Amino acid sequence: MAQRLPWRFVAEWTSEGEMVLREVKRIYAAGATRYQEYMIAELAGIGKALVLDGKVQSSILDEHWYHEALVHPILLAHQCPRKVLVIGGGEGATVREVLRHSCVEHVTMVDIDEELVELAKKHLAEWHQGAFSSDKLELVIGDGRRYVENCHRKYDAIILDLVDPMEGGPAARLYTLEFYRAVKGCLRPGGAVVTQATSPTLSPRVYAVIRNTLAKVFTIVRPYVSYVRSYNGLWGFVAASDTVDPAKLSAKEVDELIAARIRGQLRFYDGETHEWMFRLPLPVRQVLSETRDYATDEKPVYVPV
């Protein structure tokens, strides 16, 4: 049963000296797994949301602005992605979007936090919409980095739906040169990878470093953005491949591909939106052009807060 609470807030740091307060209207589940603290709650302004280690990871208001932006550009740019690997994405919405594609025959989802996945199955049905029950899904509980380093399968697309690289957190190892080399080793010829890449406005250097690190491994690297109110502004992604280039798709081509290959009605992504996402604002382009650093296991990148 949902629990009604007196006055309470989620206080989320967005940058040094700046935070967002959201009133907690109702808590559905809260506690800690082996890997992270969690809360599934109704929050003022954004509705039902998943909060991990004090940061809003996803909300019912605009989760589709994130998940559709993460998944569809590289899958539509690929000729026909049959096998897809998802690292992270514990709430199931990324797999939900992958399974919309008629080409997809098999999805492997690797998440380290089994407790959180079970909580998502129970409390976040609006997100996964039954995706965990699909015959096409293989759910692997384990370390995403270890999985790709020991990968015996080849995938057409790899989607990295990760938490931010925080100092002391497990995800920083999933944004390094060594990790991206291992990811490339899991791709079939003509394959592509996409990663969430933090905020180009709140952590612009981190966004640029992630782009630069992927550029050390792949010949085609395309940074792009979406707007996610729950994340307090623009949110960044980077697609990478040696052959697949989503930025070359026109609005007309995207709309035709959606009609031909995607089941059901999308709520955020279409051809016009696709073109907008790859047209980065001038300040973001400036940071990308000025930043030379890249991340390694020895020198990882971290979000400021």
From Swiss-Prot:
Belongs to the spermidine/spermine synthase family. The keyword Transferase applies. Homodimer or homotetramer. Involved in the biosynthesis of polyamines which are thought to support the growth of thermophilic microorganisms under high-temperature conditions. It seems that long-chain and branched-chain of polyamines effectively stabilize DNA and RNA, respectively. Catalyzes the irreversible transfer of a propylamine group from the amino donor S-adenosylmethioninamine (decarboxy-AdoMet) to 1,3-diaminopropane to yield sym-norspermidine (bis(3-aminopropyl)amine). It can also synthesize thermospermine from spermidine with a very low activity. InterPro entries: PABS, PABS_CS, SAM-dependent_MTases_sf, Spermi_synthase, Spermidine_synt_N_sf. It comes from Hyperthermus butylicus (strain DSM 5456 / JCM 9403 / PLM1-5). Its main location: cytoplasm. The active site is at D161 (proton acceptor). S-methyl-5'-thioadenosine binds at Q36, D111, D143, G144, P170. Keywords: Cytoplasm, Polyamine biosynthesis, Transferase. NCBIfam families: MFS_SpdSyn, PRK00811.1. GO terms for molecular function: spermidine synthase activity; sym-norspermidine synthase activity; thermospermine synthase activity. Residues 7-242 form the PABS domain. It holds the Pfam family Spermine_synth. It is found in: Cytoplasm. One of its GO terms (cellular component) is cytoplasm. Spermidine binds at H67, E91. HAMAP family: Spermidine_synth. This is Polyamine aminopropyltransferase 2. Its EC number is 2.5.1.23. It comes from the Archaea. The keyword Cytoplasm applies. GO terms for biological process: polyamine biosynthetic process; spermidine biosynthetic process. It catalyses: S-adenosyl 3-(methylsulfanyl)propylamine + propane-1,3-diamine = norspermidine + S-methyl-5'-thioadenosine + H(+).
